[in-house]
Amino acid sequence: WDAEPGALYTLVMTDPDVPSRKNPVFREWHHWLIINISGQNVSSGTVLSDYIGSGPPKGTGLHRYVFLVYKQPGSITDTQHGGNRRNFKVMDFANKHHLGNPVAGNFFQAKHED
């Protein structure tokens, strides 16, 4: 993403298709959450949730893995991500911390390899 000098960012990775796209009762599962990233230096941020790679269970079809970057209005001091990884609501997190709309995003799809 095009980072502004001196700005702080949040990076989140979620899977909205848990346990499956047809039955997403645990939507969203967050795989990674980092706050207070200085510019594009991800390693400078505070990790609230360690990275867990993609790994859809057998028989659940394609899963979308979504990366979103938000520009922060200032430093986030609340280091609670909201509890469990399942049923994480990225919009709720963004609203709580006044993040506005994402400034960057990307996604990929994966399915279980038989």
UniProtKB/Swiss-Prot annotation:
Pfam families: PBP. CDD domains: PEBP_euk (cd00866). Belongs to the phosphatidylethanolamine-binding protein family. This is Protein D2. It comes from Onchocerca volvulus.
